[in-house]
A protein has these predicted regions:
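Conserved AMP-binding/adenylate-forming core of the ANL superfamily
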Residues: 4, 52, 66, 70-124, ...
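AMP-dependent adenylate-forming
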Residues: 31-32, 55-83, 193-199
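ANL superfamily adenylate-forming
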Residues: 76, 159-228, 349-351
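Conserved AMP-binding A3 loop
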Residues: 80-85, 223-226, 232-256
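Short beta-strand->loop structural element characteristic of the AMP-binding/adenylate-forming
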Residues: 110-113, 119, 123, 127-179, ...
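Adenylate-forming
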Residues: 114, 156-175, 308-312, 331-379, ...
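Conserved AMP-binding/adenylation subdomain of ANL enzymes
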Residues: 253-280, 288-334, 349-350
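Conserved AMP-binding/adenylate-forming
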Residues: 363-365, 372-493
Length: 493
């Protein structure tokens, strides 16, 4: 009944989510859903938002409770913790630097960074002053990155000199130099020395210098209020059918959907709230996967984000699928997420977690990216039973880059069936449709969302008249319904 209400009374449901999370805006909004249309739904007209503002409103309370904002490690064993005040100060310092370089609201900032705290700092700095964020992982080569960044014409490029992965260092200075040469829109390059303290490129600024400021301006800095639908970030489709689609999501829609998913369905509370055990959220991802964006959402309500940069399976010479588990055990992770393939590899390697007593902090396991097999789920459940955690909860989700969220996910109140997902998410009118556009149960169909969501793409960057957007999502069926491309065919139940 609750799900049906949430998908038939969209205005009332999303207003209740706004109220539940006490979302802030200096200006009032007309209604949650002003125009119910697909495409073209209009949400919270009149409201203002800023993703970074929602993050930092929890900084003081989380810090006072003694919890860090970010805990990170890499495969070389470098352990770092970033406090909430330091996260805010560094983001403010970089934001002021970006403004001094001429960054205006709506300008794009491209990042070529690994999954380290500096990437989160850079994101918060960019969006706090209205810049539009876009990131590619450093495991991508020049051509793949340019296929994405050339479409959005970034004004500023933030890039690293290289990364460590699989037991080896991978220099990326030449890739960065080639990118800058091929992107005439770039007016300023910020170089993060991730491998070599002496790395440099001509006419670049050291990232460390941009986050070093600590004065009255950084102390008083606050993210600017933006229109609810101001562009937040640009993410990309896989590019298997042409150039990757540059998908634009807005501040307000992204943060409200992320909060509903993370708190109501993933059951991830805030670090400083009573009875949430000092919540520590980890979802293994590179910065090139939308799950990095999902990991970021932990900051939206004061959760500690616990991130790992490196190969989860060790190296080619020394494979070790206990790497991430040891990382989680050593850092008190409470929610441990990864792609379903990770759990399949752990099963295949026949690893034993019984000696990692620190894993008793974990109270939930999350999976996505591909179907999780029954055998892999049973393996994980048995491992945690041996650790003294019977019936560990699995939060298996199906989502998409396209709408920065999930359609199907977890519910602690429902039974677990190995290899299956528990429920359709609140607010997501998800069905399986046959070729005639009719809903089907127990049969193969296309995964369809038949009602609008606040986090639907605003548009594709540079897509004149929304032609590419419409053909991607709204050509298959009549009556203006959209489907998640790449959602896969599967039996509906």
């Amino acid at each position: 009944a609750l799900w049906r209400w949430s998908t038939t009374e969209l205005d009332a449901f999303w207003q209740s989510i706004w109220n539940y999370f006490d979302l802030q805006s200096p200006t009032p909004h007309q209604a949650a859903l002003v125009k119910n249309a697909m495409p073209g739904g209009q949400w919270f007209t009149g409201a203002q938002a800023n993703y970074a503002q929602q993050v930092f409103r929890h900084a003081d309370a989380a810090h006072a409770a003694g919890f860090p904002a970010i805990i990170s490690e890499n495969e070389k064993g470098l352990h770092r913790e970033l406090s909430w005040p330091e996260l805010k100060r560094q983001a403010a310092s970089l934001a002021l630097h970006l403004q001094a370089q001429g960054l205006q609201p709506g300008d794009r900032v491209a990042a070529y960074l690994p999954n380290i705290p500096e990437a989160m700092v850079a994101f918060l700095a960019v969006v706090s002053v209205g810049g539009v964020w876009s990131i590619c992982a450093p495991d991508m080569g020049t051509n793949a990155v340019l296929d994405r960044f050339a479409q959005i014409e970034p004004k500023i490029l933030i890039a690293c000199d290289g990364v460590s992965y699989g037991g080896r260092d991978h220099d990326r200075l030449q890739v960065v130099a080639d990118m800058r040469a091929a992107l005439p829109s770039v007016q300023h390059l910020i170089l993060l020395r991730n491998l070599d303290d002496q790395a440099s490129l001509p006419d670049s600024t050291d990232f460390a210098d941009t986050i070093a400021r600590n004065d009255a301006a950084t102390q008083s800095f606050e993210p600017m209020w933006l229109d609810f639908n101001h562009p937040l970030w640009i993410v990309y489709s896989s590019g298997t059918t042409g150039l990757p689609k540059p998908i634009v999501h807005g501040h307000g829609g992204t943060l409200i959907v992320a909060l509903a998913l993370k708190v109501l369905h993933n059951d991830i509370g805030c670090s400083y709230h009573p009875n949430t055990f000092g919540e520590r959220y980890h979802w293994y991802s590179s910065t090139g996967w939308v799950m990095w964006n999902a990991q970021l959402s932990g900051l939206l309500n004061g959760t500690t984000c616990v991130i790992y940069d490196g190969n989860p399976g060790g190296s080619k010479d020394k494979p070790d699928w206990t790497t991430l588990w040891r990382f989680a055990a050593n850092n008190g992770v409470t929610f441990f997420g990864a792609g379903a393939a990770f759990f399949a590899n752990c099963l295949k390697a026949n690893i034993d977690l019984s000696g990692l007593t620190g894993l008793q902090s974990v109270r939930a396991l999350g999976t996505t990216g591909s179907p999780l097999s029954e055998d892999a789920q049973r393996w994980g459940t048995q491992q945690f039973e041996r650790l003294g955690t019977p019936n560990i909860w699995w939060c298996n989700i199906s989502g998409g880059t396209d709408f920065a969220g999930a359609f199907i996910g977890g519910n602690r109140e429902l039974p677990l069936v190995p290899g299956e997902m528990q429920c359709r998410l609140l607010g997501c009118a998800v069905e399986a449709w046959n070729e005639q556009g009719q809903p089907v149960l127990g049969d193969v169909g296309e995964l369809v969302c038949a009602q609008p969501l606040p986090s639907m793409p605003l548009y594709f960057w540079g897509d004149k008249d929304n032609a590419r957007y419409l053909s991607s999502y709204f050509d298959m069926y009549p009556a203006g319904h959209g489907r998640q491309p790449g959602g896969g065919d599967g039996p509906a139940s």
